[in-house]
Amino acid sequence: TFEIIVVMNGCRDDTREVVEQAAAGNRAVRIIEFTQPLGKGGAIWEGLAVANGNRLAFVDADNMVRAPEAEKLIRALDSHDVAIADRFAGVEEGGTSQPPLRKLISRASRLWVRMFLGLPYADTQCGAKAFRIAAWRRIAPRVLERQADNAQ
């Protein structure tokens, strides 16, 4: 079983209606609403704090990571404690492409992370990550809450 938690973070558009319509009759979908913006990191923390289960994942709602890629992310937890999606994977198969300047900045950031931090990961800035609950419990106390949430 699974649950989907949608954190409404000071939204001023029709996001709630879109989510309610898409989730109509699906008891696995839960909406948590905050009238004051928490910021992206705050929304992630609030969603993870109320999540149930032995696997946790979050995906930004900007459509950069499509459902098939999100499924791969979850399946990666079969053999890994943590999984990070890649915004550039799947773009050819219908994912959302970034504007040229944003793409350049994203790729430069990826290069910086690899060169200067020595991390082997392809896309630490991707807004889609998954964790086994035991790994999350070890990692969470070390994360600077609501600060540079993607890079951590």
Where are these regions (language model features)?
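A general secondary-structure junction signal
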Residues: 6-8, 86-87
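A conserved acidic beta->alpha catalytic loop
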Residues: 8-17, 63
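Acceptor/aglycone-binding surface of glycosyltransferases and processive sugar-polymer synthases
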Residues: 34-50, 55, 67-146
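Conserved donor nucleotide-binding strand/loop of the catalytic core
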Residues: 2-5, 16-50
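Acidic donor-binding loop at a coil-to-helix junction in glycosyltransferase catalytic cores
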Residues: 148-152
